[in-house]
Amino acid sequence: MSRPDYAVRLLRLAEEDLNEIVSYVAADRPSAAEELADRIEKNLQLLSRIPGLGRVPAEQQLVRLGYRYLVIENYLVFYTLEGATI
């Protein structure tokens, strides 16, 4: 029996950052912005199935707080796991 996927919840600040990044890229290259948004979405979906996928940061304070991160192109996506929510 498989475990259900974890829920992925973006903080409001993360949503704002994501929108700003996609808008910035779209100003010069709309198709690249769409590809970036799709790549981030696919990585978040993968993370919901495999929450240990991300790397452990080198900064010990972040490690103590339970942070991990994904590298998506030139961007870092930091996350924590709280119960069944990322």
Which functions belong to the PLM regions below?
Residues 54-86:
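Basic/aromatic recognition patch in beta-strand/loop cores that engages polyanionic ligands
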